[in-house]
């Protein structure tokens, strides 16, 4: 089942997507159908789109691997956009090796995509064999490690101990902070305006409300948001002056119930959508490669994910450490 225009995975035309690990829970979104299909063994791999966490959140919630590549590494040509400035396309698989293989044929420059990066992809599968013993890990504790579900906090602490044995060092780092950027709403409305203004009744209620909100973003606010986005993508480079990779919990909370997701109060509830994307959205903003790998389960059997992020075009290093941890 598919969600409407990358909005979420609960309100779908064919009914809500359900988590294979607990069918009363959501699989995450918006690529929840892709994640659920991979987790249930219905396919070897699936593609997801990620604007605020829509590959990695479902990967964490469904105990699979989800890779959001560097912005522009995989062409978005032909994809219905949510936000031209933030959309990423990447693979969702059961193992890191599968993710490396799935990334290979879709990565690379597309001259017909204005956001495509002019880069020649390396052999991603070969990167799984490279040593990670010299890797310096960065831990951005501010924001990313705050207000975690106690079971996620416990599981991530265990994962960090494993990573410390695999790598050279760990140290705390600071990442650039930002306020809410109105870029997504404005760009989503711009794409949908020709259809939305003529037949708004064809859109689901949640999508309709969010598009209406995007229509109210002023030109000045959008321009300032784009300027801030460019600043953040330049500023985050300095975070890798003393570390090679970053490690964060993929989500600060466990998957909510389908019933809660369908209630749709119109604005994110406490602990709801905004919080569930708190740890994933920054890496869309920064445009950095980020992979979520399974790292355990809650006592009630709900999956928990660990994220590893790298510098611009650092997919090889991200995959290498993710694979080493997985083993």
Task: Give the location of each predicted region.
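Charged, often glycine-rich, active-site loop that binds/positions anionic groups
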Residues: 10-15, 180-195
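General small-molecule cofactor/ligand-binding pocket signal
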Residues: 169-174
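Short, flexible loop segments at the rims of nucleotide/cofactor-binding pockets, characterized by
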Residues: 13, 23-25, 114-117, 222-228, ...
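Serine-dependent amide/ester hydrolase catalytic core
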Residues: 167, 192-285
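Short, surface-exposed alpha-helical segments at coil->helix boundaries
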Residues: 153-157, 186-189
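A short beta-alpha structural unit
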Residues: 141, 145, 175-187, 210-214, ...
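Structural helix-boundary/capping segments
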Residues: 40-146, 157-166, 217, 223-227, ...
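Short glycine/serine-rich loop/turn segments
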Residues: 1-89, 142, 248-269
């Amino acid at each position: 089942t598919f969600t409407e225009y990358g909005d979420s995975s609960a309100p779908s035309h064919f009914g809500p997507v359900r988590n294979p690990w607990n069918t009363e829970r959501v699989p995450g979104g918006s690529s929840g159908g892709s994640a659920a299909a991979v987790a249930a063994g219905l396919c070897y791999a699936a593609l997801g789109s990620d604007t605020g966490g829509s590959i990695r959140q479902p990967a964490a919630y469904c105990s699979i691997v989800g890779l959001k590549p560097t912005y522009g590494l995989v062409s978005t040509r032909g994809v219905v956009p949510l936000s031209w400035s933030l959309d990423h396309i990447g693979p969702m698989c059961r193992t890191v090796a599968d993710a490396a293989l799935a990334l290979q044929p879709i990565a690379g420059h597309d001259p017909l995509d204005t956001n495509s990066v002019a880069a020649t992809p390396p052999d991603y599968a070969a990167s799984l064999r490279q040593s990670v013993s010299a890797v310096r890990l960065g831990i951005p504790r501010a924001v990313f490690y705050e207000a975690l579900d106690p079971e996620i906090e416990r599981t991530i602490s265990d994962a960090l101990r494993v990573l410390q044995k695999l790598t050279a060092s760990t140290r705390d780092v600071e990442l650039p902070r930002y306020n809410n950027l109105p870029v997504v709403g404005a760009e989503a409305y711009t794409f949908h305006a020709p259809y939305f203004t003529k037949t708004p009744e064809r859109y689901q209620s949640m999508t309709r409300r969010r598009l209406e909100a995007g229509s109210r973003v002023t030109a000045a606010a959008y321009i300032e948001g784009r300027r801030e986005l460019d600043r953040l993508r330049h500023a985050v480079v300095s975070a890798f002056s003393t570390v090679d990779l970053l490690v964060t919990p993929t989500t600060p909370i466990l998957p909510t119930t389908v019933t809660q997701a369908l209630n749709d109060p119109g604005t994110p509830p406490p602990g709801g959508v905004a919080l569930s994307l708190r740890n994933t959205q920054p890496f869309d903003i920064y445009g950095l490669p980020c992979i979520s790998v399974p790292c355990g389960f809650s006592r009630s059997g709900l999956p928990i994910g660990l994220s590893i992020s790298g510098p611009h075009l650092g997919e090889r290093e991200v995959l290498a450490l993710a694979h080493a941890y997985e083993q």
